[in-house]
């Protein structure tokens, strides 16, 4: 049906008869001469037709998004008529034959216009996908999947599918449940990850497994979350943390070659505690400096009781400083007010600061600081004339969170972030347990190997867990797993999953661990998030062919939707009114 893709035609094809197919991108009638920009997956080419052509009458019928097959001779455009924005901007095809394969209603969205309301784009996603940008995204997505498969296969990993219909197990989010027609009153769960099955594959001697896995989580959505998503999932036997990290680094190095980046190995490693204390995040963006500085000791003799009391409780409280170089000449009062309002959204009671001016240090905190305390702050933060030092004080968790967010906000405001940089980081030594209102739960998941399980303070127990971070975004992570039944039971007990409940929920795993499970560990990389970063897309929805909205609905198909009474009866379900 065609001899060339539209954007493949070049000056070497001048004089040749060309046959192309695609959609009418734009249509123009200039004094009786018809110009059509034809679009296919490769790009655009201009078709031209004057009244002397036998294709002229058909060309007059063409409108936007009509499906066309065109035949004609390639020629150079006239002087001054070239379009430097197009790959084919020096060429046009003089129409000899034109077939309208299909007509189109007037499109409700302009193809390729990102400023169109997103709900409308998602409702007509099949039209939105016609844009050249969308094609390039999904071309790269396909290439990266192939690179991942080949890279892991070369390292001896087997691609093995794990079940989609499975058993509900607590992994941090709500499960999507599927009622069983055969087993009345019982439900399957869609997997939040292949976690337990890939561990069982290691027990089964598969040694190295991977899959590009579909996962499902019924959770509140953000810009980088979807209820169904894809991850590059892998597990390996007889391995250390270093072995797993090495595989991930090799894999990411191969993947980023696809977009022309040669990333260096090994990646920097940072303990979780250091990441939180110095950057206020377990996924710090290291493309810029701006570390958080602990200055609690500078407030020990403060005349402000609130600050001095906080300074005397270093286990539970923090006073953090953020020195922003040269900010005094840039941040107006209105900007300082905006920054205060920003941190107050995340639990701050206000935003104290010191302005380092030619005639001394100014700001509301000065009167509460001793001469020694002020001097120590300036030394610790390295503050000089023209700088502003911001302070956060209070509960450790809250302060680290909002000061970490402030760090990012300031970097964005001052344009400190190199958008072309790739800064990879391993965050390691995560806490094994986190305290909640209902006791402790596993910070990663309860199948992670702890480092010091006998420690009486559960919050001090660390896990053999690791996250890989790119530019402040968690790409993925993993852990060394528990491979002995006794240890698994100990961990369950720490999070109040006692024997009866453990057997009910995880009996199959505990049973498997009795039969010589090898030491093993693995990782998962968020595939959608990876492609979002590689393409610099603003939303994860841009890199998924048919994504859900932030309300977990599909505007294209109107899913989820009601089902009829007969289907409900077959599933033994009665809906309450």
Curated annotation (Swiss-Prot):
The keyword Aminoacyl-tRNA synthetase applies. GO terms for biological process: aspartyl-tRNA aminoacylation. Coiled coil: none annotated. It comes from the Bacteria. Its EC number is 6.1.1.23. InterPro entries: Aa-tRNA-synt_II, aa-tRNA-synth_II, aa-tRNA-synth_II/BPL/LPL, Asp-tRNA-ligase_1, Asp-tRNA-ligase_1_N, Asp/Asn-tRNA-synth_IIb, AspRS_core, GAD-like_sf. CDD domains: AspRS_core, EcAspRS_like_N. It holds the Pfam family tRNA_anti-codon. GO terms for molecular function: aspartate-tRNA ligase activity; aspartate-tRNA(Asn) ligase activity; ATP binding; nucleic acid binding. It catalyses: tRNA(Asx) + L-aspartate + ATP = L-aspartyl-tRNA(Asx) + AMP + diphosphate. ATP binds at residues 217-219, 226, 474, 526-529. The keyword Chaperone does not apply. Signal peptide: none annotated. It is found in: Cytoplasm. SUPFAM superfamilies: Class II aaRS and biotin synthetases, GAD domain-like, Nucleic acid-binding proteins. L-aspartate binds at residues 171, 217, 444, 481. Aspartyl-tRNA synthetase with relaxed tRNA specificity since it is able to aspartylate not only its cognate tRNA(Asp) but also tRNA(Asn). Reaction proceeds in two steps: L-aspartate is first activated by ATP to form Asp-AMP and then transferred to the acceptor end of tRNA(Asp/Asn). Belongs to the class-II aminoacyl-tRNA synthetase family. Type 1 subfamily. This is Aspartate--tRNA(Asp/Asn) ligase.
């Amino acid at each position: 049906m065609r001899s060339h893709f539209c954007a493949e035609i070049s000056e070497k094809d001048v004089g040749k008869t060309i046959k192309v197919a695609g959609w009418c991108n734009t249509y123009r009638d200039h004094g009786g001469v018809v110009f059509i920009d034809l679009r296919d997956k490769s790009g655009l080419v201009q078709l031209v037709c004057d009244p002397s052509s036998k294709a002229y009458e058909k060309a007059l019928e063409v409108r936007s998004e009509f499906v066309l097959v065109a035949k004609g001779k390639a020629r150079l455009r006239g002087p001054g008529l070239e379009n430097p924005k197009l790959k084919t901007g020096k060429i046009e095809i003089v129409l000899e034959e034109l077939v309208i394969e299909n007509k189109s209603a007037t499109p409700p969205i302009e193809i390729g216009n990102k400023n169109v309301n997103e709900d409308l784009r998602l409702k007509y996603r099949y039209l939105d996908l016609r844009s050249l940008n969308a094609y390039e995204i999904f071309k790269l997505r396909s290439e990266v999947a192939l690179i991942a498969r080949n890279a892991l296969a070369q390292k001896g990993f087997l691609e093995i599918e794990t079940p989609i219909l499975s058993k509900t197990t607590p992994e941090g989010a709500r499960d999507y449940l599927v009622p069983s027609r055969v087993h009345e009153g019982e439900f399957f769960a869609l997997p939040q990850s292949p976690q337990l099955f890939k561990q069982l594959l290691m027990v089964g001697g598969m040694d190295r497994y991977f899959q590009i896995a579909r996962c499902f989580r019924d959770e509140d959505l953000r810009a980088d979350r979807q209820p169904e998503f894809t991850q590059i999932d892998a597990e390996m036997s007889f391995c250390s943390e270093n072995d797993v990290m090495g595989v991930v680094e090799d894999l990411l190095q191969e993947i980023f070659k696809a977009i022309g980046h040669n990333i260096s190995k090994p990646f920097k490693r940072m303990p979780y505690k250091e990441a939180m204390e110095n950057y206020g995040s377990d996924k710090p963006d290291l493309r810029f400096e701006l570390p958080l500085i602990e200055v609690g000791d500078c407030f020990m003799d403060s005349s402000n009781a609130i600050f001095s009391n906080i300074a005397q409780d270093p286990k539970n409280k923090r006073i953090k400083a953020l020195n922003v170089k040269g900010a005094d000449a840039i941040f107006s009062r209105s900007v300082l007010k905006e920054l205060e309002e920003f941190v107050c959204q995340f639990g701050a009671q206000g935003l104290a600061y010191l302005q380092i001016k030619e005639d001394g240090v100014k700001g509301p905190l000065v009167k509460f600081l001793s001469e020694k305390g002020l001097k120590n702050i300036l030394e610790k933060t390295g503050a000089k004339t023209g700088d502003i030092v911001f302070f956060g004080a209070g509960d450790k968790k809250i302060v680290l969170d909002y000061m970490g967010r402030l760090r990012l906000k300031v970097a964005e405001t001052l344009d400190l972030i190199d958008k072309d940089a790739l800064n990879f980081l391993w965050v390691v030594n995560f806490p094994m347990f986190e305290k909640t209102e209902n006791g402790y739960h596993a910070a990663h998941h309860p199948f992670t190997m702890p480092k010091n399980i006998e420690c009486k303070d559960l919050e001090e127990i660390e896990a053999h867990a690791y996250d890989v971070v790119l530019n402040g975004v968690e790409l993925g992570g993993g852990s060394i797993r528990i491979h002995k039944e006794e240890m698994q039971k100990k961990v369950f007990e720490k999070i109040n999953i006692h024997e009866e409940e453990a057997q009910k929920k995880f009996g199959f795993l505990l049973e498997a661990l009795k039969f010589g499970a090898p030491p093993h560990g693995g990782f998962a990389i968020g595939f959608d998030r990876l492609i979002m970063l590689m393409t610099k897309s603003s939303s994860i929805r841009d890199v998924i062919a048919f994504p859900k909205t932030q309300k977990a609905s599909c505007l294209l198909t109107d899913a989820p939707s009601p089902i009829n009474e007969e289907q409900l009866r077959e599933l033994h379900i009665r809906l309450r009114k």
